[in-house]
Amino acid sequence: MVNPKIKTLKNLKALVQNLQQNGQTIVLANGCFDWLHVGHIRYLKAARALGDYLVVAVNGDASVKKLKGISRPLMPVNERTEILAALTCIDYVVVFNELNVEQVLLSLQPQIHCKGTDYTEQTVPEREIVKSYGGRVAIVGDPKDHSTRNLLQRSMKIDKNTSSDSNK
């Protein structure tokens, strides 16, 4: 089933330009979103609150593997995008296969580019790109207390404890 929220960059560019011409504020958030957790939800809701439309750019499988390691992603990109598209705070989802979101930013030129609290406005890698077209960077979400890596470690610990309990 085709989800109308999931767009190609080309289709999304035309849509975003039309929305901006009509005075709408576009916010872009990005990430791997491999095993969605409450930290992601808080980040996305806070990003959505800054504008009229929230676009989420999702790393493709190859870029997740390069960024996070050979055992990742846990879920393929088609599943990650479907889950994200189901969230009411998200208006559109687009996949990018590069290691960073610069090409998406240059193409869409959202007024606001959001990053999580593991960044500061000075450490956002794409900040110069965003400034170059007149956009701004916003740091949103709760403190970086949640991560997929921590969830994986806890899950593995629970699994080991469960296995040893069943051997008694």
Where do the protein language model's features map onto the residues?
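Nucleotidyltransferase catalytic core that binds NTPs
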Residues: 1-168
